[in-house]
């Protein structure tokens, strides 16, 4: 139905708009387009987040070990106060980023989880079984390795640190090697990392909590109930969810449960169904295209939306219908994703990665039990857990390898699973109050992530040639 207008000799709506854009484009606009287009293309690349995070990490380590290192580290301890009226909240910049801004990170993680569970790789047990089993092994074995090195004392609380995989770094490396690996491997690692994130969220909720305030928990439960009512009632506007999400964060902040979990809980209440079905949108699109052609053919046609209200109405209706065919979950994920990738996570790295190698005594620090436990857990624990649990799942018939993926590919992914970084750094802040133990954990995370990335890249580069599909 939508193609009939093209067959009848009418120019498609997209071609008309592109032609008018080229006609009306000024020379300066074209110049800015040539300058900004490469930058915009970079921001849209899958690897961009990992590249920015890597650059931020290097700059943070340089700053922390420079002549201004002490001032740089003290900067994050400054106190800030914000609120409305008598409702005031005071915290350090460090806590504002870790407890506040990182809630947006967990919100995006929750949105990704819900999407994958609804329509993605985790939507059916047959597809989800292998990455879920692999993620389980990649959490259990590293925790056991760490606990074997640190079975007693305060250091034992860090067992959750090596359980997480950083999806930005790991998937970014696979994308760089995409010409040497089957496409199914990237999908497998993405599903594994998302299942891994779910496990990390559960660990934080169940084991890294402070003294529980039942009153605050009760208030948070009431807010969560209201969010669920909004979802069931078909409310798709973002503002009510945003307001209640802030109240949920404040309640959890005073409850003893880590406040960033508000992001995950909020994400699971965001509607996943669009207001307008695709078939209805297609019909509306054809109607708008016909209306646009009729307007363009009118004798009094004015090629300027500011002085042509009918043309402006068509454009506004098209924009409104385009929003309606997207679910609130999609819109929120697309809007928040770049902010989290390029603002929140780099700020988190600036705030948490800084290590003064002189104070920690680098060589001695590498031999500390916490550093060794984290490093061994991430590098060898992740590799062993992911590979062994995957083998068990396939042997028992519970899961299956993705199309064209062979065991040599999966072993490369198992090495990349040792890139912990963001979530591991976050858990280390919850596990230890002692600054020295936090520094040792950071050193272990950075060392393990670097080793895992190097081993995984080398393994997949030399052993990751694409498998030929089996003949029928």
Swiss-Prot record:
Transmembrane segments: 48-68, 91-111, 129-149, 157-177, 185-205, 210-230, 237-257, 337-357, 374-394, 410-430, 443-463
Main location (coarse class): membrane
GO molecular function: sodium:proton antiporter activity
GO process annotations (BP): regulation of pH
Gene3D superfamilies registered for this protein in UniProt: Na+/H+ antiporter like domain
Topology class, membrane: Multi-pass membrane protein
Location in or out of the cell: Cell inner membrane
InterPro entries the UniProt entry points to: Na/H_antiporter_dom_sf, NhaA
Catalytic activities: Na(+)(in) + 2 H(+)(out) = Na(+)(out) + 2 H(+)(in)
Coiled coil: none
Record's function text: Na(+)/H(+) antiporter that extrudes sodium in exchange for external protons.
Family named by the database record: Belongs to the NhaA Na(+)/H(+) (TC 2.A.33) antiporter family.
Protein name: Na(+)/H(+) antiporter NhaA
Taxonomic classification: Bacteria, Pseudomonadati, Thermodesulfobacteriota, Syntrophobacteria, Syntrophobacterales
Recorded name of the encoding gene: nhaA
């Amino acid at each position: 139905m939508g193609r009939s207008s093209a067959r009848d000799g009418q120019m498609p709506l997209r071609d008309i708009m592109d032609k008018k854009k080229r006609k009306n484009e000024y020379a300066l606009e074209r110049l800015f387009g040539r300058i900004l287009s490469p930058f915009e293309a970079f921001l849209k690349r899958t690897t961009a987040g990992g590249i920015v995070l890597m650059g931020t990490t290097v700059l943070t380590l340089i700053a922390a070990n420079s002549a201004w290192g002490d001032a740089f580290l003290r900067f994050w301890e400054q106190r800030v106060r914000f609120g409305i009226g008598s409702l005031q909240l005071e915290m350090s910049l460090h806590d504002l980023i870790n407890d506040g801004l990182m809630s947006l990170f967990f919100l995006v993680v929750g949105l990704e989880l819900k999407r994958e569970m609804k329509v993605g790789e985790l939507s059916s047990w047959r597809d989800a079984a292998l990455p879920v089993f692999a993620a389980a092994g990649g959490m259990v074995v590293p925790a056991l390795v760490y606990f074997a090195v640190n079975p007693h004392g305060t250091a034992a609380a860090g067992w959750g640190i090596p359980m997480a995989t950083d999806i930005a770094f790991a998937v970014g490396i696979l994308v760089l090697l995409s010409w040497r690996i089957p496409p199914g491997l990237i999908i497998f690692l993405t599903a594994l990392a998302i299942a891994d994130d779910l496990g990390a969220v559960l660990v934080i909720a169940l084991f890294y909590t402070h003294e529980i305030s039942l009153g605050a928990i009760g208030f948070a439960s009431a807010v969560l109930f209201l969010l669920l009512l909004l979802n069931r009632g078909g409310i798709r506007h973002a503002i009510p969810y945003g307001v209640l999400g802030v109240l949920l964060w404040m309640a959890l902040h005073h409850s003893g449960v880590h406040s960033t979990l508000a992001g995950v809980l909020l994400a699971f209440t965001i509607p996943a169904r669009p207001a307008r079905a695709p078939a209805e949108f297609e019909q509306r699109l054809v109607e708008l295209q016909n209306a646009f052609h009729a307007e363009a053919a009118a004798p009094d046609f004015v090629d300027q939306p500011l002085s042509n209200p009918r043309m402006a109405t068509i454009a506004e209706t098209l924009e409104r219908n385009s929003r309606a065919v997207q679910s609130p979950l999609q819109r929120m994920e697309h809007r928040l994703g770049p902010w989290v990738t390029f603002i929140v996570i780099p700020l988190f790295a600036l705030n948490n990665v800084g290590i003064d190698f002189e104070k920690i005594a680098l060589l001695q620090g590498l031999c500390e039990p916490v550093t060794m436990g984290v490093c061994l857990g991430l590098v060898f624990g992740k590799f062993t857990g992911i590979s062994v649990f995957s083998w068990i799942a396939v042997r028992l018939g519970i899961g299956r390898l993705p199309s064209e993926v062979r065991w040599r590919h999966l072993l490369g992914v198992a090495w990349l699973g040792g890139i912990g970084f963001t979530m591991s750094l976050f858990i280390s802040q919850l596990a230890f109050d002692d600054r020295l133990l936090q520094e040792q954990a950071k050193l272990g995370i950075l060392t393990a992530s670097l080793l895992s990335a190097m081993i995984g890249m080398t393994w997949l580069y030399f052993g990751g040639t694409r498998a030929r599909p089996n003949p029928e």
